[in-house]
Amino acid sequence: MENRWQVMIVWQVDRMRIRTWKSLVKHHMYVSKKASRWFYRHHYDSPHPKISSEVHIPLGEAMLVVKTYWGLHTGERDWHLGQGVSIEWRKRRYSTQVDPGLADQLIHMYYFDCFSEAAIRKAILGHIVSHRCEYQAGHSKVGSLQYLALTALVAPKKIKPPLPSVRKLTEDRWNKPQKTKGHKGSHTMNGH
């Protein structure tokens, strides 16, 4: 019988980001209770030796599973030390991988109070609406002018510690272009 391979997307992440993610998840599960329905699985509860943790986030009938890995092959850069994250959406027997932005939107939709564009319609109909968003990471686009005007009236409340964002966890902070202070360019390239 031949080998069958299964390919999955694993976002390379440094271990400090993973530690921060885990501590934020645990804080909001056990202290603030904003994520009390989430389930945290430790590495010693997992049958797979490369999984360092799993966070199971119920989304109605579906579930979002964020797995962190260790002991992976290192990347092309020195700081890619074999740590990674995969994000999976499951419903019954179907599962698919999702990107961090979509994961944050799903978490936002199910768990955190938000003053969204739908709130304008609800307010006109006389329904009680939340006047601020607790989970800013769940918004991927700029809102309408009405939405921006209404949010300008109410300053966003900073939550300490912040809510765990999957997008922030997988953000590539090393490959952003670096800016050097006080240099207009290379002297050899400028001809000076």
Curated annotation (Swiss-Prot):
One of its GO terms (biological process) is viral life cycle. Residues 151-164 are annotated as: Multimerization. Residues 14-17, 74-79 are annotated as: Interaction with host APOBEC3F. One of its GO terms (molecular function) is metal ion binding. Residues 40-44 are annotated as: Interaction with host APOBEC3G. Residues 176-186 have a biased composition (Basic residues). It comes from the Viruses. The record marks L150, T151 as: Cleavage in virion (by viral protease). It is a peripheral membrane protein. The modification Phosphoserine is found at S144, S165. A motif (HCCH motif) lies at residues 108-139. Induction: Expressed late during infection in a Rev-dependent manner. Residues 75-114 are annotated as: RNA-binding. GO terms for cellular component: host cell cytoplasm; host cell plasma membrane; membrane; virion component. Processed in virion by the viral protease. Homomultimer; in vitro and presumably in vivo. Interacts with viral RNA and Pr55Gag precursor; these interactions mediate Vif incorporation into the virion. Interacts with the viral reverse transcriptase. Forms cullin-5-RING E3 ubiquitin-protein ligase complex (ECS complex) by interacting with host CUL5, RBX2, elongin BC complex (ELOB and ELOC) and CBFB/CBF-beta. Within the ECS complex, Vif interacts directly with host CUL5, ELOC and APOBEC (APOBEC3F and APOBEC3G) substrates. Belongs to the primate lentivirus group Vif protein family. The BC-like-box motif mediates the interaction with elongin BC complex. The HCCH motif (H-x(5)-C-x(18)-C-x(5)-H) mediates the interaction with CUL5. This is Virion infectivity factor. It comes from Human immunodeficiency virus type 1 group M subtype D (isolate Z2/CDC-Z34) (HIV-1). The gene is vif.
